[in-house]
């Protein structure tokens, strides 16, 4: 089934200048970029986006990291886009990620792990709406 999902290329990947390589992974695996923008998250936006993690011990570090530099936010579309994106990203901890996944190839740590991807179709819908107006899609 054709779906849309949200992907964020995080500040560590932008600093390494691997944005193009990451986008190529998506496109060469059947995911089309239907909307994209580069921005610098404010603390408030990062806190709102990651509100589900507010009570977790890593929340403060996550917010500091996500506002430490620009990010690239994209809507990816394709067959089973949510699951495909998750597979391409690999495990959250790059040390556990399979060889050939984005995190195994480009991430440094569980915190600086290169990419974010929606974990469900419902969250994809909400996350896309957080960054993109319907007219932009």
Swiss-Prot record:
MF (Gene Ontology): ATP binding; metal ion binding; nucleoside diphosphate kinase activity
Coarse class of the protein's main subcellular location: cytoplasm
Domain of life: Bacteria
UniProt key word Ubl conjugation: no
Residues that, per the record, bind ATP: 10, 58, 86, 92, 103, 113
Catalytic reactions of this protein: a 2'-deoxyribonucleoside 5'-diphosphate + ATP = a 2'-deoxyribonucleoside 5'-triphosphate + ADP; a ribonucleoside 5'-diphosphate + ATP = a ribonucleoside 5'-triphosphate + ADP
The enzyme's E.C. designation: 2.7.4.6
InterPro entries: NDK-like_dom (IPR034907), NDK-like_dom_sf (IPR036850), Nucleoside_diP_kinase (IPR001564), Nucleoside_diP_kinase_AS (IPR023005)
Job of this protein: Major role in the synthesis of nucleoside triphosphates other than ATP. The ATP gamma phosphate is transferred to the NDP beta phosphate via a ping-pong mechanism, using a phosphorylated active-site intermediate.
Family: Belongs to the NDK family.
Subunit structure: Homotetramer.
Protein name as annotated: Nucleoside diphosphate kinase
Species this chain originates from: Helicobacter pylori (strain ATCC 700392 / 26695)
């Amino acid at each position: 089934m054709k779906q849309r999902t949200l992907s964020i290329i995080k500040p560590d990947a932008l600093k390494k200048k691997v944005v193009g390589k990451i986008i190529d992974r998506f496109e060469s695996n059947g995911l089309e970029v239907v909307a994209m923008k580069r921005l610098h998250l404010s603390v408030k936006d990062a806190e709102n986006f990651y509100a589900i993690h507010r009570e977790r011990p890593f929340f403060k570090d996550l917010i500091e990291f996500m506002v430490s530099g620009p990010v690239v936010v994209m809507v990816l579309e394709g067959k089973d886009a949510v699951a495909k994106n998750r597979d391409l990203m690999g495990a959250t901890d790059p040390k556990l990620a399979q060889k050939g996944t984005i995190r195994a190839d480009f991430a440094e740590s569980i915190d600086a792990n290169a990419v974010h991807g929606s974990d469900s179709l419902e969250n994809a819908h909400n996350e896309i709406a957080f960054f993109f107006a319907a007219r932009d899609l």
